[in-house]
Amino acid sequence: MTINLLDGIILKSVTQILAELFPDKYEGIPDYILEEKARYGTEIHRFIEVIEKKKPKRPIAYIKKYFKPSVYQIESLKEYLRLKKEYNIEVLESEKRVVYKNYYAGTLNIKGLVNNESAIIDVKTTYELDDVYVSFQNSLYEMADEPVKKLYCLWLPKGHRGKLVEVKRINKKVLKKLIGEKK
């Protein structure tokens, strides 16, 4: 867990805010399964960050050489690269830390262009896509950073074909009420 500090003040994370908004999201799922899913997703995020920062000519070969990805992770990375090409995704920043005043902080996955339009993209490896959750997540990231044209989820479910899904932007008034901002 990351502790978000701003001038000595501990800030909530976007994940903590969402856990309060969706308290039953993972109800009934055993901890060991949640931990395994989190580990898998974290590794996919790390591999994507490495690909985007190192820009190897042969990304899959590079990841195989320096890491130990599973067969499923390799397939997810192939899907990532396919979607990146299909939607002309240009990654400008990855794993960018953002802070909204003294209310919250978080790490947005990808800031870039999708078909030449500015976007925030969250990468998910979940079995089912929860677009409402991702809408709130990306809207909070956008409010902490700067406006973009569109918000997306790059969904890479384990063992299945990936998708780039546009998600709705949540109204700023709703977000400010959620975080307790009075203005």
Regions found by a protein language model. Give the residues of each.
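Metal-dependent nuclease catalytic cores that hydrolyze phosphodiester bonds in DNA/RNA
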Residues: 1-105
